[in-house]
Amino acid sequence: MLFAALRDVQWRKRRLVIAIVSTGLVFAMTLVLTGLVNGFRVEAERTVDSMGVDAFVVKAGAAGPFLGSTPFAQIDLPQVARAPGVLAAAPLATAPSTIRQGTSARNVTAFGAPEHGPGMPRVSDGRAPSTPDEVAVSSTLGRNLGDDLQVGARTLRIVGIVPESTALAKIPNIFLTTEGLQQLAYNGQPTISSIGIDGMPRQLPDGYQTVNRADAVSDLMRPLKVAVDAITVVAVLLWIVAALIVGSVVYLSALERLRDFAVFKAIGVPTRSILAGLALQAVVVALLAAVVGGILSLLLAPLFPMTVVVPLSAFVALPAIATVIGLLASVAGLRRVVAIDPALAFGGP
């Protein structure tokens, strides 16, 4: 019966090719959406990792060192720096801002850190900013060293380029000195949003808490939660569409082969063997569609304006998910086969 199912696939190859390509495109879009969600996290992880700190010290109750921070005066910085387990401490600040590009404005995320860190990323070209009027920018902005950049109400000189530094769905990052960020966002007040530390403090002054890198990444991703949830819903709907495509093909195949199935039953072929052949047909279609989907996802990902990083686990899981979809999609056809009367084999044309 399995051989008969594969022969049927061969004879109906045109229809099945259309189903495989259609389902493969759905699988590809699902992989791209998975990569889009993963890309949000990868961006945040790259940003946090580039700062080169082991942990962040924030005010007690703050949700994180970036978007969930509670700004505070840096008067306690020396005390934190002397805490047991702290190798180095630096005042850090973060604020959303805009830059001017011709007649239009573009959102950026501004970070402030000392020139030599911790907290200042390495640049691929130029150097780190050393004065409040200098800035290092993401290479995604397409700016050159020596250009003037209007950030908010200030005009800064670009002295460094940070490779592919983005967060919050491809929003470019820019890096100033801590004093430069304070002038940009806090009217020059000695206010910071966190203290970046090397090492791990065993005791902190009252009113402060430690945030590890994983929680810092989550803080940077928090504004994207609604978008991630929406993308997840769309991905689930696409899985359902894939199952419907495969199911419709298998069901039509079952309807067209009713006489064949009746003959099989009449000559004593077990129903379970017939069902296995039909299920195999659905699984073959789904698995071939998974291969097509994996290839298409690699071609589609670069076309998206945001970072798309499809995790290896998604490619590994796709064949298993495709198999489950194939089996579920074959249910309608299986029920039709079970109901076939063997007497149909002896009926007229």
From Swiss-Prot:
GO terms for cellular component: extracellular region; plasma membrane. It is found in: Cell membrane. The keyword Transport applies. The chain crosses the membrane at residues 17-37, 230-250, 284-304, 308-328. Pfam families: FtsX, MacB_PCD. PANTHER family: ABC TRANSPORTER, MEMBRANE PROTEIN, HEMIN TRANSPORT SYSTEM PERMEASE PROTEIN HRTB-RELATED. Belongs to the ABC-4 integral membrane protein family. This is Uncharacterized ABC transporter permease Rv2563. It comes from Mycobacterium tuberculosis (strain ATCC 25618 / H37Rv). The lineage of its organism: Bacteria, Bacillati, Actinomycetota, Actinomycetes, Mycobacteriales.
